[in-house]
C-alpha cells in the first residue's frame, strides 16, 4: 500500500512558499548611474600622526584634594631624618594627660596618630626596598605614636567601664536619689564654687545621668529626659534663691509641672535669667489650665523642643 511521505526515491521534497522563491536578479547599472557615497570617512580629516608621548611623571596631574595625599607628609615623596622632630621632643601622650581630654579630642588625636602612622609605614616600606634598612628616627617616632594610640584605647576603656558601672548602680532608685542629693549639696549648691564652673559640671552631669545633650537636636524625649529637666529646674531655684525674693518664693515648693520645669531648664545658669523664668512661671500659674497633665508630659515636651529648634534655626538663618 502506498504511503504518503516527504521522501521519495529521487530525494527529499521541500515545500515551496513565497519566501523560498528565488528573488529575481537586479540588472547591473552602468558606472555613470551609481551614486557615490555621501561620506568618505567617519573620522576627522584634520587628524595627523604625531610622535608618541613617553609616559613620565611630568605628564600626570594629581589634584590637591586627592585622598592619597594623606599618605604623604607635605606632599614629599619621603622625608629625611632632619624633617622629623628631634628625638628629645618625641614622647607619647601619658594616660593622666589623656584622661583630661574629651571624647571629641581623643577622637581627633586618634585619627591624627593614625594618619601619621600611615605616612611612616609608607616611608619605612620605601626605605626597606630602596636602602635596604630603616632609620632609627622613623622607628622611634612610630613606636611613640603607637604607644599614644593604645593609651587612648586604655582611657576610653576606663570610661566605658565607669559608665557601665554607674548605669548599673543608678538602677536602684534609692541609691540614685541619695547620689543626686549628695552631688547637689556638695557641688552644685556649694557657694564656694563659681557659677561658671557649676554650669560646666552640669553640662557633663545632665548628659551622663539623664542623657540630655547641650545640642538641642541631639535629644530624645523620654521619661529620663523629663526627670532630668525637673531636677535641673529645682536645682537652679535652690542655687539662686538667695539672690532674689521672687526666686525664693517660687523655690518654697518643688517644681513638678513639666511646663514650668522646661522654662527653667532653657534659662541660662545665672540669677537674672532664672528671675525672668520665675516671672514667666508666675504668669502661668494665674490660670489652672496651663498645668500640663502627667499623661501629656512627653508629647508636650516634644512640641516644646520642636518649637525651640525651629526658633534656633530661624535665628541662625537671619544672623
Swiss-Prot record:
Component of the mitochondrial ribosome (mitoribosome), a dedicated translation machinery responsible for the synthesis of mitochondrial genome-encoded proteins, including at least some of the essential transmembrane subunits of the mitochondrial respiratory chain. The mitoribosomes are attached to the mitochondrial inner membrane and translation products are cotranslationally integrated into the membrane. Residues 15-24 have a biased composition (Basic residues). The lineage of its organism: Eukaryota, Fungi, Dikarya, Ascomycota, Saccharomycotina. Keywords: Mitochondrion, Ribonucleoprotein, Ribosomal protein, Transit peptide. It comes from the Eukaryota. Residues 1-14 form a transit peptide. Its main location: mitochondrion. One of its GO terms (biological process) is mitochondrial translation. InterPro entries: MRP-L47_sf, Ribosomal_uL29_mit. Residues 38-48 have a biased composition (Polar residues). GO terms for molecular function: structural constituent of ribosome. Component of the mitochondrial large ribosomal subunit (mt-LSU). Mature yeast 74S mitochondrial ribosomes consist of a small (37S) and a large (54S) subunit. The 37S small subunit contains a 15S ribosomal RNA (15S mt-rRNA) and 34 different proteins. The 54S large subunit contains a 21S rRNA (21S mt-rRNA) and 46 different proteins. Present with 7700 molecules/cell in log phase SD medium. This is Large ribosomal subunit protein uL29m. Pfam families: MRP-L47 (PF06984). GO terms for cellular component: mitochondrial inner membrane; mitochondrial large ribosomal subunit; mitochondrion. Belongs to the universal ribosomal protein uL29 family. Residues 1-55 are annotated as: Disordered. The keyword Ribonucleoprotein applies. It is found in: Mitochondrion.
